[in-house]
Structures are given as C-alpha cells and as structure tokens.
A protein has these predicted regions:
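Short beta-strand/loop motif that positions the catalytic acidic residue
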Residues: 770, 776-778
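Short beta-strand element of the alpha/beta-hydrolase
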Residues: 598-600, 606-616
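C-terminal catalytic histidine-bearing segment of alpha/beta-hydrolase fold enzymes
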Residues: 379, 384-391, 791-831
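Active-site mouth of glycoside hydrolases
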Residues: 26-293, 302-327, 333-353, 357, ...
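N-terminal cap/lid segment of alpha/beta-hydrolase-fold proteins
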Residues: 560-603
C-alpha cells in the first residue's frame, strides 16, 4: 500500500465528502410496495462488492485500517453506499485459492481479529451513512463454505476445483444441502454471527442500521438436478432465512443467488427459493465471460450479444419478481479488460460500455419506481497495488476485487481506472437524480413576472414516482447573488402529481429561486428559475454625459456627409416573380462599406418596409421570396459582421476602440443602423410612413438606438436587447464585460473612464428619445442579456409601449413560438 495514493484519492474525494459525508443517524432499510425504503425515502442504488472489508478492518494479518478508511471515503465520494461484504472465511489458512486469514477456524472456533475487523468496518460505514450486505456462507471454495462444512461433518476433505476439476468439485459440494450435520454447523455459525455485539460501537448487530441485509451465502446452489436435492436446497434456504429473521427481525434477508443460472437453469427453482416470506428481496448475478457470452478474443465483437443476453436475463427474473412485489438486486456482474489484460491502467473500453448499459437499466427503473432496485458490480480493487510476480493472490499481496482463485485484476475496478470511475460516478449521480420527484415552477399564468401588491404565491408542480415524505427549501436571492430569504416546507407527496406553494413579498427587481429537497441534512437541487417583481418599477438611472446629445448630433451630421453610394446586386437564385432579392452595398460613417440583404416586391406600388437588425456575429439567412409578398424587407449587416466580415476576423467587436468614444466600435455600428433607414427610405417603392424595425440581442440594441436617433421608424420590436445598463450588466453576466474590461485595462483605462466611454452607447441613455410605439420581448432565464438590463432601457421609454416575457426562454427569444405572431399583430396596427 502506497500512502501517497491514499492521499491523492482522498484529495479527489474531499469536495464531495465535505458536503455529503456528514455523520447522519441512519435507519433500517425495509421493503414497501416493492421498493427499498430508508428514512422514509426509497432507494435504488449502485454499489460494489468489497468482500475483503472485514480483513482490512482487522488489526491482525492482512489488516490495513488506513486503506480501509481511504477506500470507504472514495466509495462514498463516488456515490456507492451499498457494499457487499464477506463476513469471514471458513477453515484453516494456507489452503491454495482460499482467502486468508479466515474467520472460523473450526466449528464455533473464531479468529476474533476478523470479527473485530468486521466490527470496525461497520462502525466506519455507519459514520459515512453506508450500508453492508453481509453474506455468511459460500458455495465456492475461495472462502471455505460448503466444502469446509462438509469436511467438518466428516464427509471428506474439502476439494479445490483447481486441483480436482470443476465437475468433481460440484459433485462433492452437492452433498451439503442433504448433510444435516454440515448444515447444523452452519446454523450455529449463523446464530453466533447474527447475535454478535459490535465491540467498537457496543451495539448488537441486530440493532445496527449499517447493515443493509443479511445474506445466506455467496451464490448458494444445490448443485443437483434431482427433485429431492432441489427440495432439500429450498428447505435449507427457507430454514436459514427463518433462523436469521428469528434472531434479527430488524434487517432484510436475501439469498445471494445468481438467478436461473445458479438454480440448475431452472427459473421455477429460483422462484420457489424467493417466494419464501422471510426472504425480502431477490438476487441475480450476471457473468458474460464466465457464462461464455464473450471469450478472451471476442470481448469487443460479442459485446452486443452480452448486452442483449443481459437484458433478457434481467427481464425474465423481473417478470417473476412482479408476481411477489419484491425488489431485484443484480449484486454481481463483471466484464474483463480489453484484450483480457489484468494490469491496472490497461484499457477498459468494453467493460465501460457494458457497465453503462447495466447502469442505464437501474436509472430507468429508478425513474419509473420499478422493481429493479440495485446493483453491485464485482469488484472493488480500489487502492490495491498489484504484485509484479504473482498472477494469483499470495499471502502478503494487497487484497483486490478478485479473490484468491482468480487472476488478480480480472474483474477489479481500481481507483486509477479513470474511465470506469467516470462511468460509475455519472451513473450514481444520474440514479440519485432519477429518485427525486420531478419539479418545475408554475409560471404559465404570469410568465414568472409578479405585479402589484404582494405577497404573491409562487407555485411548484411536483411529480413523484412513489410516496415520499420530504423537506423542501426555497432559496431566493437577487439576480446579483445577494441572499434574500429561505423558505422551508415539509410535505407528504403521493404518487403522481403534487404541489407546493410559497408566498413571496419582494421589492421590484429580478430574483433567482432555487428549490431543494433536504435528506439527511443534505440539500439536492430540484429546480431553479428567475422571477420578476414589478419590473417596470426598477430604477436604473441614466448616466448620460453632458455632451451626449451633442456627440450623437455630430455623429449623425458626419454620417449625413458621407455619400451612401447605394449599389444593388441582383440575387436571381433567391428571387421569383413575387419578390426580387438583392445584395446591397453602401457607404456609412467614416466611409466604411456596409451591406445587407433586400427583398422587394416586383409589382409596382408603395409598400411598408421592415428593417431587421442582426445579432452579434450572426450570418445572413435567406427568406422565401414569396413569404411576405406585400412587404419590403431589408436585413442590415453592420460593419465587420455577416457579409462584411473578413476571413479569419475575430469577433471582438464589442471591445474595439474602447479607449475613446469617437473610436469605439458601436459609434459606427449605431450609425450603420441609421444608414439602413436612409437606404430603405430612398427606395421608390417604400411607403415612408410605414417603416418598422426589429432585432434580437445586438439587433435589439440597434433597433432601440436607430429609433432613438431617427424618427422615421414608426414602430419597433426589439427582443433580448444587448448593451443595456453596463455597470449592472457587467456584474450580472460575464460577457461582454470580460473582454471589454480586458481591452480597457490594456489601454490603461480606469473603470471610471471605461464606463464613461460606454455611457455614450448604453441603450438606457437612448430610449427616452424614442417617439414610436415599442413592443419588447425578453427571456426570463436569459443569462446573456439578463432581464434586469432589458428593463433598465425599457423603463425610460416615454411613448406607447408593452412587453412580453417568455418564462422558460433563455437568450433565444426569437425562437419562441409566440413571438413572431406577437410581432405581426403589433405591426399590423400600423400597416
């Protein structure tokens, strides 16, 4: 064991552990309506096999408590809180392919260091809110199990498959279920284990919530096709389950079965075992390699076969589970590394793909509240080092997921297996999320904007896949991130639709509301939204400089002095007999060539004209020339953008020329917006009493600027307007503030000087000049042009005005289904 590796993995895990590994008071798991329930909350889980946990916890041979604690921390951080653990091995140490040290040396004679290790393991798991499935027996040789009990009962020496062959081994251990003396030795062992009191906590095992369930054994089999043998096997399983329940009624009991494969291929036999009323849930195992679905040289090519067979195997067992309403746990599955390698760090492409598929089955079941409730992959190698010489485990080697009879690294998942670890982490997070009730804020009635005297009621719609008792918190903060208030509610959710309501009384402004569910002291986010309260009362004072009007008057005079030199280039491929398309070029402020796309009706007459101002960095899009046959449409490309952008040109326009108001990019861009009006009004077919404009984002800002600088626009419809309220804008959004501030710093400007320059181009300083009707659309969730900045400009408009809020929209307001119709209805008033 390398201490540095422990430290490194702990560093990775610490961020998660700080918030989620608080010591909570756990409770016993129970089954209700086919669901695992703990602390009144159902549990679908991803766990792992950690068979050697009790050995690591001991202070004797093989013990390594520092590693144990590091492994538990890592597993907890990865979201795996269910560990399947061997109580202890049986028989003397030193037997080939048997793990050591063992727990039970002879019937009723124990190596207490292993028991103390198990005590320590359970105590440490309890501290982390983790739970153990403890299996007591084993049908295989690697921990003694059946063969050792038969040897103690005088049935001959326990055989080793590697020495005598698989068939001979199976024949010998098939006697276990009919050997009364061997079974009685085991029943005595069960009594001793289940009745134990933990020496670390002083708590009887039967009262320890760190135990998820008792398990009869690892892959218990009857190894016999005859009806008498199978009946004896069923009797053994039922008797053991009843014995455990009589000793400990608090904990679940499970079989440890592989499913049909471990029941001589008989689903009815598996069903009979699990119909036992003392067996609380059903187990299956799946081994694509061991069962020859894939071989060493077909791990990749036969992966689809393995996945298909896996689904079939799961489904056929779930069909039986439905009859009894019992959960199913796939508590063992594994897949070899690529090219059948064993070394840490070798690729695991096929394993990762197989794991992803199996994990997806649990996620689907969790969402639906299904009976497929948990899985434990085999097995956790964690921080183990690998021997440079031993393929199979030898005393002194680190324990890993592969017991002594298997190649070390065959099925182990090590902490350094980054791709597999990422798959596991993604799965545990997805399953945890799937277990939560679905939540959304009900914003349809008022679009998330509350007006008038409060308090106002914010409703939340919840959909639960199962009955849940839960605590909820609603955290409200300003859009600047300042905490306002946290509201708490407890609720008993029924399966299906539910609702919560919170009464809010807030000052004018925009806010962030986040809904959390609280479990075991840990908050998990369910939903978030932005909200607005009386946005038309938001006060964002103008900061016009004394020469603001003079500056723009001079700019417009300078623009007027530039001959436009309009040039229309026909675009026949985008024209028809209804409207003709042209690429337009013209001169603007400073002699800069700008351009645009024009659609003009073919028929003679006077037509209304619509100017479209484009978003930041947008490309020109070509319309159907027949779409608006009675409309002139002109899409402006401002300087350096769209048609005017040079190959390889950076999109840093928002920061260009920031050192001086006369050189700042948007002085020219705003002049370009006015030049577009000049052009449209110059057309013979334009009805100059019906010239309108609209634009999105940057186009929204240009629409506002154009209307404030030129009264020839008769109505405008900006959406998600850009460039509003710079001082607040740069706090609320990272862009465009970051590049502008960086350019200002490079130019040696103070913040005060930067904001002074920007004030000449702040849309809120323009909108009081607008003389035409306005309709504005905003996205309530817009992170690029936050609603606060939209209303900073809107609230200075003095003419007829209205606004529309799309409560679920981010910045893409122009894609909202209702906005084109709303614009059309608005402009229809003035056509």
């Amino acid at each position: 064991m390398k201490p540095t590796r422990i430290l490194s993995i702990l560093t990775i895990a610490s961020a998660v552990l700080l918030c989620s590994c608080q010591a909570q008071k756990p409770s016993f798991v129970r089954v209700e309506d086919g669901q695992f329930v703990c602390e009144n909350y159902p549990s679908h889980f991803v766990g792992t096999n950690f068979w050697y946990g009790a050995i690591l916890g001991s202070e004797g041979v093989g013990g390594d408590r520092a590693r144990l604690e590091a492994e538990l921390d890592t597993l907890k951080a990865l979201g795996m809180t269910n560990l399947r653990v061997l109580v202890g091995g049986d028989g003397p140490d030193g037997i080939p392919t048997r793990v050591s040290p063992t727990l039970q040396k002879e019937p009723g004679v124990y190596n207490d260091t292993i028991f103390w290790g198990l005590d320590y393991l359970l105590a440490e798991m309890a501290e982390r809110n983790m739970k153990a499935v403890l299996y007591i027996n084993n049908s295989w040789e690697w921990s003694g199990g059946y063969g050792m009990y038969l040897e103690w009962a005088g049935a001959g020496k326990a055989l080793i498959p590697a020495e005598v062959g698989y068939t001979a081994y199976c024949n010998s251990v098939s006697e276990f279920v009919t050997n009364e003396k061997a079974k009685e030795f085991f029943y005595d062992h069960v009594r001793h284990v289940v009745s134990r009191t933990n020496t670390v906590t002083g708590k009887p095992y039967k009262d320890d919530p760190a135990i998820f369930s008792w398990q009869i054994g690892n892959e218990p089999r009857c190894f016999r096709p005859d009806s008498l043998g199978q009946a004896a096997f069923v009797d053994f399983m039922w008797t053991t389950a009843a014995l455990i329940k009589s000793l400990d009624p608090n904990h679940l009991v499970s079989s440890g079965s592989e499913g049909r494969h471990g029941c001589e291929g008989s689903l009815p036999l598996w069903e009979k075992v699990h119909s036992c009323p003392d067996i609380d849930y059903m187990n299956i195992h799946i081994w694509p390699y061991n069962w020859s679905w894939v071989r060493e040289n077909t791990l990749k090519t036969n992966l689809p076969i393995a996945i298909a067979n896996t689904d079939e195997y799961i489904n056929e067992h779930l069909a039986i589970a439905e009859k009894y309403g019992k959960p199913v746990v796939l508590e063992e599955f594994g897949f070899p590394r690529d090219d059948f390698q064993f070394a840490q760090g070798t690729p695991t492409t096929s394993r990762d793909a197989y794991y992803k598929h199996v994990f997806s089955r649990i996620e689907e079941s969790a969402k639906a509240g299904g009976l497929f409730a948990g899985l434990n992959f085999w097995g956790w190698g964690g921080l183990a080092s690998q021997s440079e010489t031993n393929i199979y485990w030898q005393p002194g080697d680190d324990y890993c997921g592969d017991p002594a009879q298997e190649q070390q690294g065959l099925n182990s998942v090590y902490a350094c297996d980054e791709s597999t670890i990422a798959v596991i982490k993604t799965a545990t997070e997805a399953i945890s999320k799937a277990l939560l009730p679905e939540a959304r804020f009900v914003l349809e009635q008022n679009a998330g904007i509350f007006e008038g005297e409060g308090p106002h009621t914010l409703e939340v719609s919840l959909n639960a896949a199962r009955e849940v008792e839960a605590d909820f918190e609603l955290e409200v903060s300003t859009d600047f991130g300042e905490a306002v208030q946290t509201f708490s509610k407890s609720a008993e959710l029924v399966k299906g639709p539910n609702g919560l309501a919170f009464d809010l009384g807030l000052e004018p402004g925009f806010y962030k509301a986040v809904l959390y569910i609280v479990r075991n002291g840990v908050r998990t986010e369910l939903a978030r939204t932005n909200l607005g309260f009386d946005p038309e009362q938001i006060i964002s004072a103008q900061d016009k400089q004394p020469d603001f009007e003079e500056f723009w008057s001079n700019t417009l005079q300078e623009l007027a002095s530039v001959a436009p030199e309009y040039k229309l280039i026909p675009l026949k491929e985008h024209s028809n007999d209804v409207r003709e398309a042209f690429r337009v070029e013209m001169k603007s402020l400073g002699g800069e060539t700008i351009s645009g796309l024009l659609y003009m009706p073919v028929a003679e007459g006077k037509y209304p004209a619509m100017i479209s101002y484009m978003g930041y960095g947008s490309d020109v899009w070509y319309a159907d020339p027949s779409s608006n046959p009675q409309m002139i449409e002109f899409m402006l490309c401002i300087r350096n953008q769209a048609f005017n952008r040079q190959p390889g040109e950076k999109d840093d326009w928002c920061a260009r020329g920031i050192a001086d108001k006369n050189t700042y990019y948007y002085r020219g861009a705003f002049a370009d917006a006015v030049r577009a009006i000049d052009f449209v009004c110059s057309l013979d077919k334009t009805d100059t009493d019906r010239v309108f404009a609209s634009g999105e984002s940057q186009g929204g800002a240009l629409t506002f600027a154009a209307a404030s600088l030129d009264d020839r626009l008769k109505a405008i419809a900006p959406s998600a307007p850009f460039l509003c309220d710079y001082p607040d804008y740069f706090v609320l959004a990272g862009w465009p503030g970051d590049p502008i501030k960086a350019a200002a710093k490079e130019a040696g400007m103070s913040d005060e000087d930067m904001y002074k320059v920007l004030s000449y181009f702040d849309i809120k300083n323009f909108t009081d000049r607008i003389q035409c009707p306005v309709i504005m659309a905003i996205g309530l969730q817009d992170p690029v042009c936050p609603p606060h900045t939209n209303f900073a400009a809107y609230n200075h408009i003095k003419t007829e005005k209205s606004w529309i809020c799309y409560p679920l929209s981010g910045h893409n307001v122009w894609q909202q289904e209702g906005w084109p119709v709303a614009k059309e209805d608005f402009f229809e008033k003035y056509l």
